[in-house]
């Protein structure tokens, strides 16, 4: 026993140890998550390589490439790892995995050729649709490099149909519009369709100078580093996002960082298809959407017009049909309303998909388990990073989650002015969900002194609300330093969040989530259980403990449904129903006779009848309320109600009569339900009484009939029982009961007058189709009764059925006690527990010495009694529209054909945006090398081609 004691003592430690490990992801899962790739992408090949880039777009001085002092073209060379997936070519540098990141959709590749090299290096020159070139120099064993190239060649050929859709997709890209207008000089191009801000103004009051300066910075970046599906992400990319994304570019940058752009390209036309296929349909989610449409960012003018409301309705409706497990959830309307200001409907739809699946899984679910979990994680971060503030919050019983939960759930859209909330979203899509923790911690840190003066939740909320309303004001209004005085509270918030709390990493958040996940899920499940139990239908024969057990077994059986996550179907199908009943109903447990196909068919027929009877909505599935109502009827303590309910199972037309076929089916149902006792797997009260009587007789014989008091009764310690004898007797009794039932049913059946029952010559034309169908079934049933008497068919009604059952002692006991006792809704079910054999039943009888002794005393006193003995039959235990005026239109905002503006340089030099790690500016991974361009002749040599050109 010392071994088990040791295990018991170590169990709490082992539980804590298990909590310290986070769930491991596969290599492909980590890869997709890091680069926000679609779910069907996986690594096919990977290799070490050096990558350099050459743009085809000339700069303002007419040069397209860097030239060294010798006049030779040069390019930065990045050393790192190159990955190939079915639709992407991904490169990351070896230094910090962020100095150079290229996520290249292979549809953008127009040409691939082997590059000549003086040093005999194995290299490829990849030409993109923009004319830019990517030089890939492989490092490593040559055959591995050739294997990578062969796979790339195969993928390019297979991707030709997708590449044909690229031009249409690029027409929706604003970055493509910028380049076409300012570099290519196209005059007939139209601005891509964007968000509501294109017509209803963007949030805030940005000056034209700053907006154009930001747009110029992004224009320069796209010119040098590519755009949309073929952009190279460098530290400058992240810096430009922190500076602030131009309103016109925000939608594209959001979907690029989130990976929604890849999903939109891969699933072109799916958004429109979902809307068209489900047009006119209704659902609970759509009803909830309609209720919240008017409450979605009402301060923004577009959502006071039908155009804005319709766009929002379309996106939310489409998502509810795409993901029916989630449908529509609280605060989803707020987030999508924020997206639609900067995005088209299709962009917002795919961005919402990736938001729910990748960034904040579980936030927008029926139970909001992700939000609740992150609230607990946030509290742990506050406790760890700001212990004094945390102690004050606990002492004054301030509910931190009351304040912080809307921040996380609405992604700050409803907490701070929109012009600042979208800046948070810029960084959120770049860095992930840790942005929410960092900003939330910074809010508390900045307002800590004021919060320490708050006594309750109301004061706490007022402090935070006032802070958010004054984000545009100076953070240091009393400072003598002008530059210091110009720093706004929002700038201070960004620096605090992303410098002081930069230690909050994704790994820390994942570890904390895993640590608190189990407790949060248990709390959600407990809450859901209590809520559902309170709303269950009224029961007369099931206790609260019974309902609790039924709830547990019901959801335990539905493997696809996760209560804590609120996903999957909460209804039970027929196959699951069979497994459900087998957990606690003796007649439905697996047995030896299940090997017989005839018996198996008989069991399924009865269970299907029971299933259909319980299916109140006639949808082919059972809800929890259906199961509770059905079980309440099944375990009734009233004998007549039990008989009536069993009769109603077969009286499908509800006329109160059973014809011949229905009687035979009812008889088969009785045989099925009584099979455990007929086969001797269990004993009923009559058999137990017989066993006790025999034991008492033996004791009396051995004592010579001289027992006078209870104290004089000595129970035998080694009594043996002839099990086979009692099995046979019980089986014969049940077989005789079944035989008597059929005999008496035919004997006492009531004759049917055909003239009264069915008018064989029906001349009426005022009856409905349904009534005529019922009469036709009655006629067919009566004709089938010809085996009894062709001229005088018979039926049995409910009173006759009662009489037949009550006339047989075995069946009377079955409906009064045995059936009810065989349904173990009062016991916890464990699927792994095996049924106990009959031997254990007899052992239990012998162990109850007091009851046997009392029986002996009654025999001695010659008191004839038939009182029932309270015992368990079966022992197995289981467990307003504001259109932009002329002066508000910035017609030349995206026109950079004029001279370079100095404002964008001032933005780049601002120290408030130098938030990245120090190593970001390091150039250890970057080398400037000579870039040998291909001559016109060599580029056309077929011997150097990998035989792909689209």
Swiss-Prot record:
One of its GO terms (molecular function) is GTPase activator activity. The keyword Repeat applies. The modification Phosphoserine is found at residues 764, 871. Residues 878-950 are annotated as: Disordered. The modification N-acetylserine is found at residue 2. InterPro entries: EF-hand-dom_pair, EF_hand_dom, GRAM, Rab-GAP-TBC_dom, Rab-GAP_TBC_sf, Rab_GAP_TBC_domain. Residues 29-116 form the GRAM domain. Its main location: cytoplasm. The keyword Electron transport does not apply. Keywords: Acetylation, Cytoplasm, GTPase activation, Phosphoprotein, Repeat. Pfam families: GRAM (PF02893), RabGAP-TBC (PF00566). Gene3D superfamilies: EF-hand (1.10.238.10), putative rabgap domain of human tbc1 domain family member 14 like domains (1.10.8.270), Ypt/Rab-GAP domain of gyp1p, domain 3 (1.10.472.80). GO terms for cellular component: cytoplasm; mating projection tip. Residues 602-637, 638-673 form the EF-hand domain. Residues 244-432 form the Rab-GAP TBC domain. It is found in: Cytoplasm. SUPFAM superfamilies: EF-hand, Ypt/Rab-GAP domain of gyp1p. Present with 768 molecules/cell in log phase SD medium. Interacts with MAC1. Stimulates specifically the GTPase activity of SEC4, YPT6 and YPT36. Inactivates YPT6 during recycling between the endosome and the Golgi compartments. PANTHER family: RAB GTPASE-ACTIVATING PROTEIN 1-LIKE, TBC1 DOMAIN FAMILY MEMBER 2B. This is GTPase-activating protein GYP2. The gene is MDR1.
């Amino acid at each position: 026993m010392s071994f088990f004691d040791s295990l018991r003592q170590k169990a709490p430690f082992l539980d804590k140890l298990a909590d310290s490990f986070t769930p491991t992801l596969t290599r492909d899962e980590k890869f997709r998550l890091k680069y926000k790739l679609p779910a069907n992408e996986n690594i096919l090949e990977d290799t070490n390589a050096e990558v350099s880039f050459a743009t085809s777009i000339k700069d303002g001085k007419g040069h397209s490439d860097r030239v060294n002092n010798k006049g030779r073209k040069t390019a930065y060379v990045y050393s790192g790892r190159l990955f190939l997936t079915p639709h992407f070519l991904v490169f990351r540098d070896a230094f910090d995995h962020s100095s150079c990141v290229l996520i290249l959709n292979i549809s953008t590749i127009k040409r691939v050729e082997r590059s000549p090299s003086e040093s005999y290096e194995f290299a490829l020159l990849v030409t993109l649709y923009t004319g830019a070139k990517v030089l890939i120099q492989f490092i490593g064993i040559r055959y591995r490099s050739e294997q990578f190239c062969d796979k790339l060649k195969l993928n390019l050929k297979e991707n030709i149909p997708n590449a044909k859709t690229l031009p249409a997709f690029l027409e929706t890209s604003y970055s493509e519009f910028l380049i076409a207008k300012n570099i290519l000089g196209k005059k007939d191009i139209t601005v891509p369709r964007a968000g509501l801000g294109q017509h209803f103004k963007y949030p805030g009051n940005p000056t034209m100078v700053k907006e154009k300066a930001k747009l110029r910075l992004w224009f320069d970046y796209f010119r040098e580093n590519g755009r949309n599906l073929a952009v190279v992400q460098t530290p400058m990319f992240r810096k430009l996002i922190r500076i602030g994304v131009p309103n016109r570019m925000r939608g594209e940058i959001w979907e690029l960082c989130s990976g929604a752009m890849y999903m939109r390209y891969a699933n072109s036309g799916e958004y429109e298809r979902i809307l068209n296929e489900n047009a006119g349909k209704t659902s609970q989610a759509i009803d909830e959407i309609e209720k919240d449409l008017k409450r979605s960012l009402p301060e923004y003018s577009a959502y006071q017009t039908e155009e804005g409301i319709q766009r929002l309705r379309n996106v939310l409706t489409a998502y509810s049909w795409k993901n029916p497990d989630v449908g529509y959830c609280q605060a989803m309307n707020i987030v999508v309303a924020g997206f639609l200001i900067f995005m088209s409907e299709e962009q917002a739809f795919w961005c919402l998909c990736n938001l729910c699946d990748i960034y904040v899984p579980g936030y927008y679910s029926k139970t909001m388990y992700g939000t609740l979990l992150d609230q607990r994680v946030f509290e742990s971060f506050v406790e760890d990073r700001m212990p004094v503030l945390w102690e004050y919050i606990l002492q004054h019983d301030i509910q931190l989650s009351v304040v912080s939960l809307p921040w996380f759930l609405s992604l700050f859209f409803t907490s701070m002015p929109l012009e600042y909330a979208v800046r948070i979203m810029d960084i959120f899509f770049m860095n992930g969900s840790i942005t929410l923790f960092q900003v939330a911690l910074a809010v508390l840190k900045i307002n800590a002194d004021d919060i320490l003066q708050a006594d309750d939740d109301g004061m706490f909320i007022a402090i935070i609300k006032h802070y958010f309303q004054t984000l545009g004001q100076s953070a240091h209004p009393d400072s003598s330093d002008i530059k210091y005085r110009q720093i706004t509270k929002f700038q201070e918030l960004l620096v605090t969040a992303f410098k002081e709390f930069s230690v909050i990493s994704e790994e820390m958040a994942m570890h904390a989530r895993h640590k608190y996940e189990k407790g949060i899920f248990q709390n959600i499940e407990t809450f859901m259980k209590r809520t559902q139990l309170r709303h269950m239908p009224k029961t007369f024969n099931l206790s609260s403990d019974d309902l609790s057990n039924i709830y547990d077994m019901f959801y335990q059986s539905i493997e696809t449904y996760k209560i804590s996550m609120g996903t999957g179907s909460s209804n039970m199908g027929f196959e699951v129903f069979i497994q459900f009943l087998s957990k606690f109903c003796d007649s439905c447990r697996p047995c030896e006779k299940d090997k017989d196909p005839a018996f198996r068919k008989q069991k399924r027929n009865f269970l299907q009848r029971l299933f259909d009877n319980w299916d109140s909505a006639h949808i082919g599935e059972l809800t929890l309320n259906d199961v509770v109502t059905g079980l309440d009827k099944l375990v009734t303590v009233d004998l007549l109600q039990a008989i009536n309910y069993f009769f109603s199972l077969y009286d499908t037309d509800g006329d109160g009569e059973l014809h011949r076929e229905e009687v035979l089916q009812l008889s088969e149902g009785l045989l099925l339900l009584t099979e455990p006792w007929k086969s001797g797997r269990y004993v009923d009260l009559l058999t137990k009484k017989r066993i006790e009587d025999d034991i008492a007789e033996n004791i009396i014989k051995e004592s010579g009939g001289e027992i006078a008091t209870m104290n004089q009764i000595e129970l035998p310690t080694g009594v043996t029982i002839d099990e086979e004898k009692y099995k046979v007797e019980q089986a014969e009794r049940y077989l005789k009961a079944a035989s008597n039932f059929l005999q008496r049913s035919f004997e006492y059946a009531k004759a049917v007058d055909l003239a009264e029952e069915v008018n064989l010559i029906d001349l009426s034309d005022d009856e409905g189709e349904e009534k005529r169908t019922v009469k036709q079934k009655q006629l067919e049933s009566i004709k089938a009764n010809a085996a009894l008497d062709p001229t005088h068919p018979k039926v049995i009604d409910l009173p006759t059925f009662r009489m037949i059952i009550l006339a047989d002692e075995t069946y009377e006991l079955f409906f009064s006690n045995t059936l009810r006792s065989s349904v173990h809704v009062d016991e916890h079910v464990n699927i792994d527990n095996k049924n106990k054999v009959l031997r254990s039943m007899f052992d239990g009888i012998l162990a109850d010495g007091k009851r046997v002794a009392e029986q002996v005393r009654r025999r001695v006193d010659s008191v004839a009694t038939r009182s029932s003995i309270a015992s368990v039959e079966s022992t197995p235990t289981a467990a307003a529209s504001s259109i932009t005026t002329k002066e508000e239109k910035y017609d030349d905002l995206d026109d950079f054909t004029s001279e370079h503006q100095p404002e964008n340089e001032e933005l780049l030099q601002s120290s408030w945006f130098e938030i990245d790690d120090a190593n970001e500016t390091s150039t250890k991974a970057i080398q400037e090398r000579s870039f040998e361009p291909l001559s016109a002749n060599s580029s056309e040599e077929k011997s150097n081609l990998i035989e792909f050109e689209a």
